[in-house]
Design a protein with these regions (language model features):
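Divalent metal-binding segments
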Residues: 2-160, 176, 180, 185-237, ...
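A structural microfeature
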Residues: 33-34, 421, 430
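Short, structured coil segments at secondary-structure junctions
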Residues: 45-47, 279, 323
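Short glycine/threonine-rich loop-to-helix capping motif typified by GTGT followed
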Residues: 125-139, 269-279, 401-404
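Acidic (Asp/Glu)-rich catalytic clusters
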Residues: 135-138, 163-170, 255, 276-278
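Phosphate/diphosphate-binding loops
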Residues: 142-178, 259-270, 301-326
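His/Asp/Glu-enriched, well-ordered alpha-helical/loop segment
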Residues: 219-228, 236-260, 265, 274, ...
Length: 445
């Protein structure tokens, strides 16, 4: 089979563990036909094949955001309080408003190189699953959507989960399990800590968390074969979540069968990250989180709440990677809006927005590790690694192209890069104007 499109670049990142290289990615029939070094072989070139010369632009698997909240983004867009859960059914049930908003949402994410997301939906998602079903059947989705049910108005509904799992088996929409919050923000004394807050010697958490109820819910979901994501910020919360996961179904090597995850992991105990790696629990980290904080204010908060001795373990992704924790990336959108180069600035460089002085540099990832988390790690978290997440023969042609070489650009300069081309199933869903001449007729309407 000859290729429809061949992408040529001096920076091909396959996310398979190989170093980026100069080569090509050949695409045909919505799939990756071949990936290789140097020039593409003659057999790939047919009479209709278009070759796109990309120079040193990074060619990567499409990016996966494993923690998004479309409902919150839509509520903000139309001026509704996203924290008021009672607003969500009316919002999601209003087709006249929600359909154009979701199209805008997909376009926004595609323009940032994102090709797949995991969405949080309260309870039964207020009927939004029906819209996703309709759009998938009509081939109108440019974004793969796995969604989770977060019990808010009623208890976890396993019957709903089974129905959604049976209903969504296509290429674009899947049901991914259940999600729940545990503790809250350390800045509000609501993060659950192993030792008391420095500013409140008798306080380890201002919230009354029903850990027994959370454990029962997770075990019930696990026994039914569903994944669970638990949001935890403080070191005690992370430890308690791991205690729960250790009671779940595991394989012969002791790793979780249902790929449960922990979201956020702001402040952790290194010993627990080792436990996490042994369990195979997935970390859903927020690599851009420093971008919404000012250095002086954030460090003052850490100093006042837990002290800088414990503060050494803030955002400790280095220990996660070294402990074998599967890493994936999220934004808690609309808290953050996906910007992969900015995530390199923050999670590789360790920088806050206003300066180039790293914080906890010893806890940072390499650019290759972070890009792998955004791609292969995200696909693994969605249980779709057999068809997404890497540039390999036979996989779906979900591809993102960045405006430069993200691996040779210093982390402090990474914010100058951006997505210039995004493909989903080999179809162009975004192209920046600067790429028009390079692409020629390859992506003509």
């Amino acid at each position: 089979m000859t290729a429809d499109i061949i992408l040529r670049s001096d920076c091909i990142f396959t996310a398979t563990g190989k170093a980026p290289f100069s080569g090509y990615v050949a695409i045909g029939g919505g799939r990756i036909l071949d990936v290789g070094h140097g020039e593409p072989p003659v057999w790939l070139n047919g009479g209709e094949t278009e070759t796109v010369e990309l120079g040193d632009r990074t060619v990567s698997p499409g990016f996966v955001d494993v923690h998004c909240f479309f409902t919150g983004w839509a509520a903000e867009k139309i001026g509704v309080d996203p924290e008021d859960v009672s607003n969500h059914p009316a919002l999601l049930g209003n087709r006249e408003k929600i359909e154009p908003l979701f199209r805008e949402y997909m376009a926004m994410l595609n323009a940032r190189g994102v090709t797949a997301v995991k969405e949080m939906g309260f309870d039964d998602f207020s009927g939004f699953a029906e819209l996703l079903d309709e759009w998938e059947r009509a081939d109108e989705l440019s974004l793969r959507v796995s969604f989770m049910s977060q019990p808010v108005g009623r208890p976890m509904d396993l019957a709903f989960g089974r129905a959604m799992q049976e209903r969504f088996r296509g290429a674009f929409v899947r049901f991914s399990g259940f999600n729940r919050m545990t503790d809250g923000s350390i800045s509000q004394l609501e993060g659950d800590l192993k030792q008391p807050y420095s500013c409140a010697s008798d306080m380890t958490c201002a919230l009354a968390i029903d850990w027994d109820a959370i454990a029962a819910e997770v075990r019930a979901a696990d026994e039914a074969g569903f994944r669970f994501s638990l949001h935890a910020q403080g070191d005690a919360a992370i430890a308690r979540v791991l205690d729960i996961y250790e009671t779940c179904c595991r394989d012969e090597s002791g790793r979780l069968v249902n790929r449960h995850a922990i979201t956020d992991l702001e402040f952790s105990d290194p010993a627990d990250l080792e436990r996490m790696g042994q369990l195979g629990a997935i970390a859903e980290i927020y690599p851009q989180i420093q971008s919404i904080a000012r250095r002086e204010e954030k460090l003052r908060m850490i100093r006042e709440k837990i002290g800088m001795e414990r503060g050494r373990y803030y955002w400790n992704r280095r220990k996660m990677a070294d402990s074998g924790v599967p890493l994936s990336c999220g934004t808690d959108l609309p808290l953050l809006i996906d910007d992969i180069p900015e995530s390199v600035y923050c999670a590789v460089g360790g920088y806050f927005p206003e300066d180039n002085e790293p914080f906890n540099r010893q806890n940072m990832l390499t650019a290759e590790e972070l890009m792998t988390a955004w791609t292969r790690g995200g696909a693994y978290a969605l249980m779709r690694e057999n068809e997404l997440g890497t540039l390999e023969n036979g996989k779906r042609a979900d591809i993102a192209v960045l405006s430069g070489n993200i691996f040779t650009t210093p982390a402090e300069d990474a914010r100058g890069l951006s997505a210039v081309l995004t493909l989903v199933d080999g179809r162009m869903v975004y192209r920046k104007e600067e790429l028009a001449s390079a692409a020629r007729n390859a992506f003509a309407p």
